[in-house]
From Swiss-Prot:
Alphabetic keyword roster: Menaquinone biosynthesis, Methyltransferase, S-adenosyl-L-methionine, Transferase
HAMAP family per record: MenG_UbiE_methyltr
Annotated S-adenosyl-L-methionine binding sites: 62, 80, 100-101, 117
Native species: Mycobacterium ulcerans (strain Agy99)
Protein name: Demethylmenaquinone methyltransferase
Family membership noted in the UniProt record: Belongs to the class I-like SAM-binding methyltransferase superfamily. MenG/UbiE family.
CDD domains from the UniProt entry: AdoMet_MTases
Domain of life: Bacteria
Length: 231
């Protein structure tokens, strides 16, 4: 899979992530210039979780994000459809489950909070995934989506686009076990909805009071919403 198939085949995407699993965390830290750690902390803060809460970390990859969430004292489940990614994080002591975001292997209303970081872009039907996340979240529970987005400054957006399409693939060739996967990354980011459009998609999927906060000038956005209480 050398280019971004924007009508993504789930098997291709899972295979691609299996192939980059071994050096995934290192590559992300290098390509983000260390911002990935800040984004994980911001996600944990936005979830507003604490001891006793049950949290689903969807598209958790190697579970590095799940470990950050667990610092709150919450009980965290790391779920991903790439078995290779979960295996690469075997030393991280959180519960791990292989599963498809559009058909989650959990009962209704079981989690106090759900989050997905840099994974919603990779789901073939991300609206279905948003509905599934609502299904497994208890009424009043919270969703936080951490995802690449649209820089707020036109000048910054131009510089960022150049980084994505020119510099990022070159850096990936130096540090990644599968640099072609990062061509997919760049193209999928360019094709992704902006902040307002994603907020609309979340609302249509059943989430209420959807708001977003830009991080790193809008390179990343945190979208948060609640599952409504039954009337």
């Amino acid at each position: 899979m050398s280019r971004a198939a924007l009508d993504k085949d789930p098997r291709d995407v899972a295979s691609m992530f299996d192939g980059v699993a071994r050096r995934y965390d290192l590559t992300n830290t290098v390509l983000s210039l260390g911002q990935d750690r800040y984004w994980r902390r911001a996600t944990r803060s936005a979830l507003r979780i604490g001891p006793g809460d049950k949290v689903l970390d969807l598209a958790a990859g190697t579970a590095v994000s799940s470990v950050e969430l667990a610092k709150s004292g919450a009980w965290c489940v790391a779920a991903d459809f790439s078995v290779g990614m979960l295996a690469a994080g075997h030393e991280r002591r959180v519960c791990k489950v292989a599963g498809d975001a559009t058909r989650l292997p959990f009962a209704d209303d079981v989690f106090d909070a759900v989050t997905i970081s840099f994974g919603l872009r990779n789901v073939v039907d991300f609206s279905a995934a948003l509905r599934e996340m609502a299904r497994v979240t208890r009424p009043g529970g919270r969703l936080v989506v951490c995802e690449f987005s649209t820089p707020v400054s036109a000048l910054f957006a131009t510089v960022y686009k150049e980084y994505l399409m020119r510099a990022l693939p070159r850096v990936a060739r130096a540090v990644s076990s599968n640099p072609e996967a990062y061509v997919y990354l760049a193209e999928s980011i360019r094709a992704w909805p902006d902040q307002a459009a994603l907020a609309q998609q979340m609302s249509r999927a059943g989430w209420s009071a959807v708001r977003w906060r830009n991080l790193t000038g809008g390179i990343v956005a945190l979208h948060a919403g609640y599952k409504p209480q039954p009337v």
